[in-house]
């Protein structure tokens, strides 16, 4: 079984913010084949199809590890893939890696604290401007919004390939270093 986690913050207040690009990609991956298997014990929205789980933690970003640990403990997936925003990559850049440090990302830090860092990551660049907290919790600019659909489509292709392949192959094929703006 593979668990794919998209990081973000719950509630409509944060729905269209940069920090929620992980949630957005989970929504793009989810189709009518998936069944909602959410439960309060998982602290998140959880969808299942065959041997694939999609998770959107509803704990707020800094406590994402609680949700990931609950699902991990219950389903015991062989593989975990976490999708998250990255301030240190230009907007629209995409990188893939296994393990490593949190890079200052509090959602990743929370997961690392509770289950370790032996999982794959899809890092989607959101760029950086001004105060980091205000920036990640801000909505995409009109110019960024013009590119969001293509970034999510590309991310969907990459994650669908990753499900069938290994992180190194996907990194070679799908890494974008420069972003779109």
Swiss-Prot record:
Which residues participate in tRNA binding? Answer: 14, 60, 62, 106
Q: Which CDD domains does the UniProt entry name for this protein?
A: PTH
Specify whether tRNA-binding is a keyword of the entry: yes
From the Swiss-Prot or TrEMBL record, give the protein name: Peptidyl-tRNA hydrolase
Q: What class of enzyme is it?
A: hydrolase
Q: Where in the cell is it found?
A: Cytoplasm
The record lists the organism as Campylobacter curvus (strain 525.92)
Provide one Gene Ontology cellular component. cytoplasm
Matches recorded under InterPro entries: Pept_tRNA_hydro, Pept_tRNA_hydro_CS, Pept_tRNA_hydro_sf
Catalytic reactions on record? an N-acyl-L-alpha-aminoacyl-tRNA + H2O = an N-acyl-L-amino acid + a tRNA + H(+)
| Keyword list, A-Z | Cytoplasm, Hydrolase, RNA-binding, tRNA-binding
Q: Where would you say this protein principally sits, based on its record?
A: cytoplasm
GO MF assignments: peptidyl-tRNA hydrolase activity; tRNA binding
Annotated site (Discriminates between blocked and unblocked aminoacyl-tRNA), which positions?
Answer: 9
């Amino acid at each position: 079984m593979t668990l794919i986690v998209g990081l973000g913050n719950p509630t409509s207040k944060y729905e269209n913010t940069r920090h929620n690009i992980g949630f957005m990609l989970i929504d793009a991956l989810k189709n009518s084949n998936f069944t909602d298997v959410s439960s309060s014990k998982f602290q998140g929205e959880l969808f299942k199809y065959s041997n694939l789980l999609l998770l959107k933690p509803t704990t707020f970003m800094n406590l994402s590890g609680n949700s990931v640990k609950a699902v991990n403990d219950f389903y015991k997936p062989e593989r975990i893939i976490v999708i998250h925003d990255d301030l240190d990559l230009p907007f629209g850049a995409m990188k893939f890696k296994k393990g490593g440090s949190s890079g200052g990302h509090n959602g990743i830090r929370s997961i690392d604290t509770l289950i370790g860092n032996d999982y794959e990551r899809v890092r989607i660049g959101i760029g950086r401007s001004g105060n980091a907290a205000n920036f990640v919790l801000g909505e995409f600019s009109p110019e960024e919004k013009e590119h969001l659909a293509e970034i999510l489509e590309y991310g969907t292709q990459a994650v669908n390939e990753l499900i069938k392949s290994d992180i190194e192959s996907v990194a070679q094929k799908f890494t974008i270093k420069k972003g779109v703006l």
